[in-house]
């Protein structure tokens, strides 16, 4: 199915989605006074610290660190997700899928500025008007505005502007809404959102944010004063930026559920913080978190491992750690998948032998290629050209990036895309065959490795999770002669007729030396791939 076919359904299927913890090294103090250096990991659901030797820690409310077993973290995450999944199952059963098409044209979103009695805003409404709306906006860290980001991601098809209102002051201090409860969750963030909606209602016509006139506001966005717990993971009284619904929050004991104002229902929301970085800085937050959370409102799930430390998409996706590129001020551009999901790009299907030349950068033109598993069309590879320009200005490598997608509706709507280490459903095929964050510079083709071929027999290979029509987990295709020109254009050959896999019966005299892929000599071709006279052939029968 087309990936954006679940967009509007996903408006009503948001689990607690959040930005990942900023992976900063911290010195933690144990109960016995010892110090331990570890890296912040996880997200709003389950956050923890990971030492260099693979040990897990969490901090209690008083900031004291203690070791935990990874199985305990997994169980805690599964318990939280299961509770929310049960709720969503009931909700989804009562709704029908809607038509697509809301991610084009001109739309307006609502941004509410919220401050607290002891935590006033450092920046003004005018500053946020510029941050969200100004064309060509720049400041100390931001490459553009939120409006610029989505206009560029959509190739001009989605003109997303924002009405910024406030600031308004909450009735309680930040710690009331943000302090972590016994489960490690923020206590009352949805209560904060509901209070903000009710307080600003006399000034705002909420009905104008119901894009499809179904009686439900698509989303609202709350920017609160202070800092983000995702970037200050030991500050357990801060709010972790996230996207959620008031309905689901009610199930968790936070708030009273959806609010009806101006004849429409407010339910889906997202949040981010005013200030970026560590406590004590006064830098306006980068737009990366806002772009990430708004993208959840569009229906995109998280592509980082929401429970462990698998690679996912790392810095290659806004929905993973790419929201922090350039300290959050230059969030990485949408991948071809994300643009396709939103209806801004239609990848070219690869079926027959094809020579591709002058493939432009993804940031400049909506061009990508897709190769599907013949046995399961929802598993496929996407080929895109990533160059260090525009929103990709902070990427670690340039060249052809290969994405492997194994779409599953349940994993997407339940925000569990990359939680299984040996079955990541949205990731890349790194040219250097190293799927770790410390080796991003070797991810692209030909890149630093100089590799020019990707096939069933190359290293790395492009295997499958699901069987093809032949009952094997092979693509039975190849991409060869991958090259990058001096001006950043990509070329390659798909299924080279000279080098590709051929039909033995139709193309070859079998009275030659025949081998299998293990190097064993055969008397005659066997079903599958054979090496005959130094070339690859495919035996059908």
Where does each model-flagged region fall?
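Active-site-proximal segments of metallohydrolase catalytic domains
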Residues: 96-100, 144-262
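Hydrophobic h-region of N-terminal signal peptides that target proteins for export
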Residues: 9-17
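Fold-level signature of zinc-dependent metallopeptidase catalytic domains
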Residues: 88-136, 175-187, 226
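N-terminal prosegments of processed precursors
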Residues: 17-103, 374
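Extracellular low-complexity, Gly/Ser/Thr-rich intrinsically disordered linkers
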Residues: 362-497
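C-terminal tail/sorting-segment detector
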Residues: 17, 529-541
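Extracellular hydrolytic enzyme modules, especially secreted metalloproteases
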Residues: 149, 219-395, 406-408
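Residue-level detector of functionally pivotal "anchor" positions at catalytic/ligand-binding pockets or at interdomain
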Residues: 494-518
